[in-house]
């Protein structure tokens, strides 16, 4: 029997949400270019949903906004929090209207076994390590231009100078711990910091643990 050429199945994905707080495209362009200059790898090619709940109805040219974002190599898959008028604009632009998931209690499906990967060497520029459904422990340094990613937490017993992304599947309890924090970028469940954010907290080039506090990152120094 010939296997069907396509199947429709339900699934869930973690998407980053870009909150649009004004209809002023010049202002959006200015702020967007600043963020892209800080961390281009974090945004470019990543699927995004536009949250339009803060936009005054009838003021935003959604087609022009989409063209602006696409010109910066951003991938827009839909909108949320849109008024009826903006939803019609979204439909004309080929964008889906996405509703945020409700926090209902559902039976938990069988989960994959939790894993921990241990790396006993330096992670060098150009290298990427990803741990699915687990934690990453590194006994060594993560150099400039290197990326370490885990669905769970990341512990680095050495210097972090590259990028570290924990909670890649949306796990908000994930943490990033390093003996020497001097990263290009740190991200937990889609919230990110650059080196200057750590400088404001006085922990640059020191040991520390980064975690989520509500919807913002926070860091505490550690006596490592």
Swiss-Prot record:
Keywords: Cell cycle, Cell division, Septation
Name of this protein: Probable septum site-determining protein MinC
Keyword Zinc belongs to the record: no
Subunit structure: Interacts with MinD and FtsZ.
PANTHER family given in the database record: SEPTUM SITE-DETERMINING PROTEIN MINC
Family matches, as InterPro entries: CAP/MinC_C, MinC, MinC_C_sf, MinC_N, Septum_form_inhib_MinC_C
GO biological process: one example: regulation of cell division
Family note: Belongs to the MinC family.
Function (record text): Cell division inhibitor that blocks the formation of polar Z ring septums. Rapidly oscillates between the poles of the cell to destabilize FtsZ filaments that have formed before they mature into polar Z rings. Prevents FtsZ polymerization.
One Pfam family of this chain: MinC_C
Organism: Shewanella amazonensis (strain ATCC BAA-1098 / SB2B)
């Amino acid at each position: 029997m010939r296997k069907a050429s396509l199947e429709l199945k339900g699934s869930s994905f973690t998407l980053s949400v870009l909150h649009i707080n004004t209809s002023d495209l010049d202002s959006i362009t200015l702020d967007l270019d600043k963020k892209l200059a800080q961390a281009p790898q974090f945004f470019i090619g990543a699927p995004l949903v536009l949250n339009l709940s803060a936009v005054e109805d009838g003021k935003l040219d959604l087609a022009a906004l989409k063209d602006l974002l696409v010109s910066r190599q951003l991938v827009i898959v839909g909108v949320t929090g849109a008024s009826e008028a903006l939803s019609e604009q979204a439909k004309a632009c080929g964008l889906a209207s996405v509703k945020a998931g409700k926090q209902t209690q559902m039976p938990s499906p069988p989960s994959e076994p939790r894993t921990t990967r241990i790396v006993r060497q330096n992670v060098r520029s150009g290298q990427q390590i990803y741990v699915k459904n687990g934690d990453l422990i590194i006994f060594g340094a993560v150099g400039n231009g290197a990326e370490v990613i885990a669905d769970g937490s990341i512990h680095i017993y050495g210097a972090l100078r590259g990028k570290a992304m924990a909670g890649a599947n949306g796990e908000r309890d994930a943490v990033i711990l390093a003996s020497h924090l001097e990263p290009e970028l740190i991200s937990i469940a889609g919230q990110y910091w650059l080196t200057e954010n750590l400088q404001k907290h006085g922990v640059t080039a020191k040991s520390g643990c980064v975690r989520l506090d509500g919807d913002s990152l926070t860091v505490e120094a550690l006596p490592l």
